């Protein structure tokens, strides 16, 4: 078998070699890498924000030129970590990262419909005993707000470096937001508010990269 792996544009050669060896150790005969920019880039001018679990990438391309290509290791994982802290401060119970991610998804769904829903999960006390937890979705909003606002500030900074003609183009045609954070209420709203432009969100979250890769042929 062979694999084609989409990676952050700034992934070092050493990191690629480590990943390649890991795949080879699993029996994969051929490993190729392609950057997220290469997968998602379009012929027309494009402003891409790809924010998943581990990192956020910002790419701005036009006229066969890359104006911005930035990778920041700050994304959904930081939301989950903040939710863990918030829940512990409110209840005294520790929840797993999986449960934190679930709360993020459920809270985000509630925010989209302007609701303050009651969320449920389980947490561990200091003796590792499991307890049911009920919290309102508004309790986890500060975690989503913190990360979303920071991502939007980076996007705004990149936007401000562009020539006026490109700024006008993206104000009209919008910014594309993909990755798992595109499913989350917050990033698109903050970006749209800061730049006053449309934000075109993927409808399938983390699966959009997989779909894009299906059309890529290996060398």
Q: Which sequence ranges carry the predicted segments?
A:
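Short beta-strand motif preference
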Residues: 56-58
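Nucleotide/phosphate-binding catalytic cleft detector across ATP-hydrolyzing
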Residues: 1-51, 61-175, 182-208, 214-219
């Amino acid at each position: 078998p062979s694999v084609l792996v989409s990676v952050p544009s700034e992934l070092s050669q050493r990191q690629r070699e480590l990943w390649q060896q890991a795949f080879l150790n699993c029996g994969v005969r051929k490993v190729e890498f392609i950057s997220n920019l290469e997968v998602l880039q379009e012929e027309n001018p494009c402003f891409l924000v790809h924010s998943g679990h581990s990192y956020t990438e910002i790419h701005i391309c036009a006229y066969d030129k890359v104006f911005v290509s930035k990778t920041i290791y700050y994304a959904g994982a930081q939301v989950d970590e903040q939710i863990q802290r918030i829940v512990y401060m409110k209840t005294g119970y520790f929840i797993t990262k999986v449960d934190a991610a679930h709360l993020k998804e459920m809270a985000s769904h509630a925010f989209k419909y302007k609701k303050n829903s009651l969320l449920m999960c389980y947490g561990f006390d200091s003796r590792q005993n499991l307890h049911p937890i009920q919290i309102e979705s508004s309790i986890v909003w500060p975690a989503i707000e913190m990360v979303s606002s920071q991502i939007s500030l980076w996007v705004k900074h990149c936007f401000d470096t562009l020539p006026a003609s490109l700024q006008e183009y993206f104000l009209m045609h919008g910014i594309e937001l993909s990755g798992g954070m595109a499913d989350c209420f917050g990033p698109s709203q903050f970006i749209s508010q800061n730049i006053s432009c449309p934000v075109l969100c993927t409808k399938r979250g983390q699966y959009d990269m997989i779909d894009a890769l299906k059309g890529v042929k290996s060398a």
